[in-house]
């Protein structure tokens, strides 16, 4: 109940403008009841982030297990879903403080290499090798390289920049992945990422 209320408030008002009192008022619980579960707004935000992460994992599992798609199509779908219009903006609005938190980067890096890539991305790449849609001798290394770049460098939420610099990043990412035969980031998706950035 507390996390659902917090997630709604973060989405509506943004993290910065949501107070712990707002969350308490929305739940109808006493201050003591909320403090029994959570010590701070930051702790609530971390749990909201965990819930969002669980939804992402379910989406990745659905894509990985979709028998109708080739390995390459699965990777393209991962990019399309993660860059859906509105999804990035919602995350940026809800949890903007994460890009300033070194602990978040450490957790994100660990989660990517220990969970996301081995459980979801590598199987998609292995399938792509088997069905001929992806050429690589190192599915694990390819998955790690692409998704570390995408998540920690290409993503303007984790590495804020200007629209012009974001377009340059997208162009380099497209050149690199296309050289590997992987058409992952469309021009429209690149423009959506640039639109998330603030001009200098």
Regions found by a protein language model. Give the residues of each.
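Helix-turn-helix
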Residues: 1, 5, 9-43, 47-51
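Conserved hydrophobic residue
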Residues: 16, 29, 130, 134-135, ...
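Hydrophobic/aromatic residues within well-ordered alpha-helical segments
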Residues: 48, 52, 56, 78, ...
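Hydrophobic alpha-helical connector segments
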Residues: 47, 51, 61-92, 143-146
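Short secondary-structure transition hinges
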Residues: 84-134
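C-terminal peripheral helix-coil segments that are non-catalytic and often amphipathic
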Residues: 119, 123-131, 159-200
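Short, well-structured alpha-helical segments
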Residues: 76, 122, 139-147, 190-194
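All-alpha amphipathic helical-bundle segments outside canonical DNA-binding/catalytic cores
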Residues: 72-73, 112-113, 126-145, 163-168
């Amino acid at each position: 109940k507390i996390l659902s209320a917090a997630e709604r408030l973060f989405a509506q008002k943004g993290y910065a403008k949501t107070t712990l009192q707002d969350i308490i008022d929305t739940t109808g619980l006493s201050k003591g009841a909320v403090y029994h579960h959570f010590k701070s707004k930051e702790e609530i935000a971390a749990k909201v982030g965990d819930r969002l992460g669980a939804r992402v994992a379910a989406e990745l599992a659905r894509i990985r297990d979709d028998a109708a798609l080739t390995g390459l199509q699965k990777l393209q779908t991962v990019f399309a879903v993660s860059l859906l219009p509105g999804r990035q903006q919602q995350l940026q609005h809800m949890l903007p403080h994460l890009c300033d938190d070194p602990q978040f980067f450490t957790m994100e890096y660990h989660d990517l290499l220990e969970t996301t890539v081995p459980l979801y991305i590598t199987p998609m790449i292995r399938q792509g090798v088997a069905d001929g849609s992806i050429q690589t001798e190192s599915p694990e290394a390819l998955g790690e390289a692409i998704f570390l770049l995408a998540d920690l460098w290409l993503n303007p939420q984790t590495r804020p920049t200007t629209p012009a610099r974001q377009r340059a990043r997208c162009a380099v990412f497209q050149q690199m992945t296309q050289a590997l035969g992987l058409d992952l980031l469309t021009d429209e998706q690149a423009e959506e990422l640039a639109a998330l950035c603030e001009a200098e």
